[in-house]
Swiss-Prot record:
Comment field on protein domains: Consists of 3 domains; the N-terminus binds the ribosome, the middle domain has PPIase activity, while the C-terminus has intrinsic chaperone activity on its own.
Keywords: Cell cycle, Cell division, Chaperone, Cytoplasm, Isomerase, Rotamase
Source species of the chain: Staphylococcus aureus (strain Newman)
MF (Gene Ontology): peptidyl-prolyl cis-trans isomerase activity; protein folding chaperone; ribosome binding
SUPFAM superfamilies assigned to the protein according to its UniProt record, in alphabetical order: FKBP-like (SSF54534), Triger factor/SurA peptide-binding domain-like (SSF109998), Trigger factor ribosome-binding domain (SSF102735)
Name of this protein: Trigger factor
Length: 433
């Protein structure tokens, strides 16, 4: 078999492949064995028609398409390897010659990976992130943890305040007419949660138990129910009950409840500070890496084929569908609720998809330029890390993945990202007051 590659404009080229006649004849034999099983010819049992009779009655041409289907996949794969091209989409194939006793010749218009012209990726100026944990940040984390232990207590006297949870009855109307979904009794609403129409929760502040009030709000212009969008509505609202969060005081007992390794408040604070400091350092490093990746990508010039963007969009839509499925929705239901269709969703995602492709091509090109590879030791370390993280054995991970190619590529790219950050020039950011 022979193959030639002729580069055309942009990211396309013409692959011309010639398969020798002896392989064509073998493919025709295979095609005949398949087709003859489906043929009925008077005087012969089904599947027992001799080849000469078949060709006399139907012509050898009746076998050509099946022979092409047999020859093409392997021939195309071998041609790709022989010419060392990297297709990014299915080719457009045109058969030039298929005939018994002659070579099989076909041409394939192929879109390949684009040329990547790297810009500066070393010595990038990136902002140094703050890693020191402040006392305020520690206290905020303590308050957050204590908040999970808070109990809801009925407010016997007093008025609704931000952060309270109120139990209300309400009935909404537009132009004096009630609308679907605008009525409820015994509804619990946390003030300040932002879960109601803008302006509704704020108007409940200052109300007392058993007090009634007309709450007037305007639906957002982009409201999902088109018949209500932009319209003013009045909600007759009654407060049935007011509850507030009673947060426990941090004691040695509570400290141990929050952290089994801490027996005192001081030990709890020390352990928490250590964990938070480690997390802040990790987060800071990740932010620095992201900035380095973005700048290296921005400095790179690539003419990205539309096919690569579409492939990435397919992946992103699939990821999105999986995420909303975890919330009990499917894509069609989401489209009905949001008023979008898949075309609009893909258009909304297109810029991100293009950036993802460009970033991946940039990092891969840097790996090649710097001759960065993932060693067996690197892969073993990553497998051990995953084993601890997900609490499953290394063998189970290998069996699930089938091979370690994905891990190998991930480790390789992570090495590139480390190189970008390690070779960056850090500048101090402007601290906010």
């Amino acid at each position: 078999m022979t193959a030639t590659w002729e580069k055309k404009e942009g990211n396309e080229g013409l692959l011309t492949v010639t398969v020798p006649a002896e392989k064509v004849n073998k493919a025709l034999d295979q095609a005949f064995k398949k087709v003859v099983k489906q043929i009925n010819v008077p005087g012969f049992r089904k599947g027992k028609v001799p080849r000469p009779i078949f060709e006399q009655r139907f012509g050898v041409e009746a076998l050509y398409q099946d022979a092409i289907d047999i020859l093409l996949p392997d021939a195309y794969g071998e041609a790709i390897d022989e010419t060392d091209i990297k297709p990014v989409a299915q080719p457009e194939v045109s058969v030039t010659q298929i005939e018994k006793g002659k070579d099989f010749i076909f041409e394939a218009t192929v879109t390949v990976e684009p040329e990547v012209k790297l810009g500066d990726y070393k010595g990038l100026e990136i902002e140094k992130q703050e890693t020191e944990l402040s006392d305020d940040e520690l206290q905020e984390a303590i308050d957050h943890s204590l908040g999970h232990l808070a109990e809801m207590v009925v407010k016997e006297d007093g008025v609704v305040e931000n952060g309270d949870t109120v139990n209300i009855d309400f009935s909404g109307s537009v132009d004096g007419e009630e609308f679907e979904g605008g009525q409820a009794e015994g509804y619990d609403l946390e003030i300040g949660s932002g879960s109601f129409i803008p302006g509704f929760e704020e108007q409940l502040e200052g109300m007392k138990v058993d007090e009634e009030k007309d709450v007037v709000v305007t639906f957002p212009e982009e409201y999902h129910a088109e018949e209500l969008a932009g319209k003013e509505a009045t909600f007759k609202t009654k407060v049935n009950e007011i509850k507030f969060k009673e947060v426990p005081e941090l004691t040695d007992e509570i400290a141990n409840e929050l952290d089994a390794e801490a027996n005192t408040v001081d030990e709890y604070k020390e352990n928490l500070r250590k964990r938070l400091a480690e997390q802040k350092a990790t987060d800071a490093e990740n932010v620095e890496k992201e900035e380095a990746i973005t700048k290296a990508t921005d400095n790179t010039t690539i003419d990205i084929p539309e096919a690569m963007i579409n492939t990435e969009l397919d992946r992103m839509v699939s990821e999105f569908a999986q995420r909303i499925q975890q919330q009990g929705l499917d894509l069609q239901t989401y489209f009905q609720i949001s008023g979008q269709d898949e075309t609009q969703l893909r258009e909304q995602m297109k810029d991100d998809a293009e950036q993802r492709v460009k970033t991946n091509l940039t990092l891969t090109a840097i790996a090649e330029a710097e001759k960065i590879e993932a060693t067996d030791e690197d892969i073993d370390k990553e497998l051990e890390k995953m084993s601890k993280q997900f609490n499953i054995s290394v063998e189970d991970i290998k069996n699930t993945l089938g091979n370690t190619d994905i891990i190998k590529n991930d480790v390789r790219i992570q090495k590139v990202i480390d190189l970008l950050r390690d070779n960056a020039k850090f500048v101090e950011g402007t601290k906010e007051d």
